[in-house]
Amino acid sequence: MAKVNAFSKKIGWIELITGPMFAGKTAELIRRLHRLEYADVKYLVFKPKIDTRSIRNIQSRTGTSLPSVEVESAPEILNYIMSNSFNDETKVIGIDEVQFFDDRICEVANILAENGFVVIISGLDKNFKGEPFGPIAKLFTYADKITKLTAICNECGAEATHSLRKIDGKHADYNDDIVKIGCQEFYSAVCRHHHKVPNRPYLNSNSEEFIKFFKNKKRNKNI
């Protein structure tokens, strides 16, 4: 007889685990899913095919891993669940590297939750520019529970909230491609102060003026 718990009551919800690179997002997703095994709760993990760092599994930088189903797009998750390959006893759906999906993943997550599934999602909150990555801003709205993790700044040791990209030792330009699959060869975690993106545009006409004004004000105080 199946154990009675929150997952057996057909009440769905969405959990979002997010933060910069090297914050332990995938490790936290794996931890939450792995503990379900002790309560005999069935789960299934999906990941986007574009993430080629590991094949047919999600893997944290601490070495933990879980098998996963690779999909090209968010709607394929629903197709798989409707197929004969799906175990009808599955209560929890895990989704890793969610930033690589488009906005349709939001609808998929909502549909799953509305139909009794617990959906646990992990992914980057910001791209290398410091802007919302893919569907993440909308997922913040839809999620019932949000866990925002931090890493350690490579420059000063403070809490890191941003992912910095460097190519051949130089900061990536704002106009570079958003997606560049890689790890420590391109990326590091940094705090807000040490996050630099050359040629970043400003929406407000007086933003650059304010930045120059404030820098001069600080410089004059130090004289």
UniProtKB/Swiss-Prot annotation:
Positions that bind ATP: G19, P20, M21, F22, A23, G24, K25, T26, D96, E97, V98, Q99
Enzyme class: transferase
One biological process term in Gene Ontology: DNA biosynthetic process
Entry binding sites for substrate: F128, I178, V179, K180, I181, G182, Y187
Keyword Zinc included in the entry's annotation: yes
Main location class: cytoplasm
The species this protein was found in: Ureaplasma parvum serovar 3 (strain ATCC 700970)
InterPro entries documented for this protein: P-loop_NTPase, Thymidine_kinase, Thymidine_kinase_CS
Swiss-Prot/TrEMBL keywords: ATP-binding, Cytoplasm, DNA synthesis, Kinase, Metal-binding, Nucleotide-binding, Transferase, Zinc
Enzyme nomenclature, EC number: 2.7.1.21
Chain's gene name: tdk
GO cellular component: cytosol
Annotated family: Belongs to the thymidine kinase family.
Location of the protein in the cell: Cytoplasm
Binding site for Zn(2+): C153, C156, C191, H194
Domain of life of the organism encoding this protein: Bacteria
Reaction(s) catalysed (UniProt annotation): thymidine + ATP = dTMP + ADP + H(+)
GO molecular function: ATP binding; thymidine kinase activity; zinc ion binding
Active site (catalytic residues): E97 (proton acceptor)
Protein name in UniProt: Thymidine kinase
